[in-house]
Each structure stands twice: as C-alpha cells, then as structure tokens.
Amino acid sequence: MDYFPVISVDLQSGRRVVSVEYFRGDGPPRIPYSMVGPCCVFLMHHRPSHEVRLRFSDFYNVGEFPYRVGLGDFASNVAPPPAKPFQRLIDLIGHMTLSDFTRFPNLKEAISWPLGEPSLAFFDLSSTRVHRNDDIRRDQIATLAMRSCKITNDLEDSFVGLHRMIATEAILRGIDLCLLPGFDLMYEVAHVQCVRLLQAAKEDISNAVVPNSALIVLMEESLMLRSSLPSMMGRNNWIPVIPPIPDVEMESEEESDDDGFVEVD
C-alpha cells in the first residue's frame, strides 16, 4: 500500500496555514511521482529522473525531479553529504525546549528561519535520539516544507523551493554547499540553523546575566569548532537583534494650585 498527500488550508488569526496529511491508498499512483524520504510527491511540473547526481539542484535546474531522495528502503538518486558536522549539536538541541531559545532575541531570530517563526521542529526530525515512525514523519516533513515556502497548493514545488532557500541562506552564512546537497532537507535546514545559532549566540551571551543550557551548549560548541573546524562557523556576518528597551513608567508630578508661588501671611 502507498500513502498519498492531502493538502488542507486553514485560516488561523487571519492568515492561511497549510497542513499535509497522508492517507493510505489502494496501490501506486497513476501519475508520475517521487519519494522524498517517506513522502510521496506527485510530479506535475518536473520530469522524474532515475539518474544519480550529486545535488538535488542538478535535477530541478533542468526541469527534472529525482525519482528517490534521501533515506528510505530505496537507493537515493541524490548523493548523501560527505559529512554531518552538526549531528552532535542537533541531538543536544533536540532535547531542549523552545523557551530555552525564545528568551534570547538573537537565538529566537536564528531559529525563526525558514518558517518565519521560532521552531525546533527541524531539530526534532533530524535528531538521532528522537525516533518517530514514518506515519508521523511524512506529515511533518511535507507540512514543514510547504510552510517554509509559503506555498499552499503544491508539494512538489515546496521541496524544490525549500532546497533553494537552504542554498541561498548557506551562501549568505558562508556554508559549504557540498554539505547541503538536498539529500535530507530536514537535516540540512537544521544544519543551517546550527550555524545561525552559533553566529547569533555571541550577541546574546554578552547580554545574558545568567546563561541557560542553550547558551552554554552553543558556547561550548563554538569553542570546539573554532579550534578544530573553524570553517564550519561560516562567515560570521550575523546582524544583531537589539532587545527592546523596557518601558519605564514615570510618576506624574502633582500639579500645584499655586503655580509655584508661595502665599505669605
């Protein structure tokens, strides 16, 4: 049996929120399709290709889509990355809570890409310590891809768009693109988020009265990478997020009836 995607759009707080849910079918699709990890993707704008290439972009740049991508009970048509330098950090972050990051303005901004709001979902899906079955993973992967690209009706273009977003942000941050071939898009988003967090952490560390577990882990990882793999830190061009200055309520002075004059008997 195969699982096919159903896309739904809800109106929440005045904005359109897309979700993808997979349902069991009664056989293989009757139209061209691909598998991105556990996700079946119907192909309407790209030709399926059985060739093996180094990068996802080697396919969609010529109007094609790899027949199989990523991990699964199949051979991927996109080659895996040569290394996963941030797997340890991803596993550590996978056990933290969102509030560990959102209390600091720069860390919050770092994990707000690519969704436009802070999320640890990509770390959860990429952690080797968090295990979910494919029934849950396929819904989450497809939903995250569509929400990241702000596309509400096309899963195929969402996966292409997400890899384009990863490549664009990687170039901005000074990340080697060979580490982000499009083999595992959820991991690759988490990889870019790690670099963003490491670049952002130095801003929040200088302002933190007492560093929490998230800042401590990021400080330790930063020190280790600077001594062993400094290129993994990227270009270090983070634009600081300045925390807002809290409003200070001033006591209003009572108005004087005598306008500053003192009566003398």
Swiss-Prot record:
Homology family: Belongs to the phlebovirus NS-S protein family.
Effect of P81A: No effect on filament formation
Chain spans, region Disordered: 249-265
Record-level GO BP terms: negative stranded viral RNA replication; symbiont-mediated perturbation of host cell-cell junction; symbiont-mediated perturbation of host cytoskeleton; symbiont-mediated suppression of host gene expression; symbiont-mediated suppression of host innate immune response; symbiont-mediated suppression of host PKR/eIFalpha signaling; symbiont-mediated suppression of host transcription; symbiont-mediated suppression of host transcription initiation from RNA polymerase II promoter
Lineage: Viruses, Riboviria, Orthornavirae, Negarnaviricota, Polyploviricotina
UniProt-recorded Gene Ontology molecular function terms: protein serine/threonine kinase inhibitor activity
Effect noted on mutating C178A: No effect on filament formation
Residues annotated with Phosphoserine modification: S252, S256
Organism: Rift valley fever virus (strain ZH-548 M12)
Protein name: Non-structural protein S
Function: Plays a role in the escape of host innate immune response by promoting the degradation of host EIF2AK2/PKR and inhibiting host transcription. Cytoplasmic NSs interacts with host FBXW11 to degrade PKR whereas nuclear pool binds to host FBXO3 to target TFIIH subunit GTF2H1 for proteasomal degradation with the help of the linker protein SKP1. Removes FBXO3 isoform 1 from the nucleus. Forms nuclear amyloid-like filaments of about 12 nm in width that may sequester NSs binding partners, causing cell cycle arrest. Also aggragates in the cytosol as short fibrils late after host cell infection.
Reported impact of P240A: No effect on filament formation
Motif (OmegaXaV): 261-265
Result after altering R173A: Complete loss of binding to host EIF2AK2/PKR. Partially disrupts filament formation
Cysteine-cysteine disulfides: none
One GO cellular component, as annotated: host cell nucleus
Pfam families reported in the protein's UniProt record: NSs
Effect of substituting R88A: No effect on filament formation
